[in-house]
Amino acid sequence: MLQLSSTAKRLGASLLLLLAFLVAYGFFVQPWHMRWGATDAEIAMALPGDPFIPPTTVVSTRAITIHAPSTQVWAWLVQLGQNHGGFYSYDWLENLFLAQMHNADRIVPEWQNPQVGDEVTMMANPPPMSIAKIALLDPGRALVLKGGWAFYLQPLDAQTTRLIVRYASFPVKGSWTAALFYYPIFEPAHFIMEAGMMLGIKQRAEAAMSTPAPKPNDPLLLLAKEARP
């Protein structure tokens, strides 16, 4: 009987592990993180930025409850961008890619009046693909970037706000090369950074309501529990 070489056995075992990972990711991990913290109603909700979403993209909807007034949350939200207050996520990780990111821990008055057409940069000296322009602005309620990254505030009461983030990927559907990069690499990385950003906004907005204001914690430590409605 023909026996498989040790190399063939290792290759077969590696392929089985890869297949198991892809199945686990596709059936369990991806469905969880694509709707992290969001309710069924929020996922089905029509939002003002939806017309900006290209049909070839993959869309996620994530949400988090913030125990602060929507006006307080908005003040942090409009500071997004490397050219302003950062993204409140893992700047040390972003800076590995020369983003020169610095996350603000205070409200800066000069950044509180964004306009449609203003640029939101993702890194220092950004190439065109790392610059997003504000496509739609509803002060206090909605901030939508061209290409389909949208942020919405839904007040639950005077002191509680839902932050809903809907994100459309770069074109993926119909392109195997784009899909091979997007699903195993970009999508999980973007989730970690976006969830960290949402937790960073939550911590800063809630800290502003406390006396004395605590320093924001590492968002990753709260990743699983803080997004619950």
Show which residues each predicted segment covers:
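Short acidic N-proximal helix/loop "leader" segments that mark the beginning
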Residues: 14, 18-61
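N-terminal Lys/Arg-rich, disordered targeting/topogenic segments
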Residues: 1-9
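Generic N-terminal initiation segments characterized by hydrophobic and/or small/turn-forming residues
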Residues: 1, 44, 90, 217-220
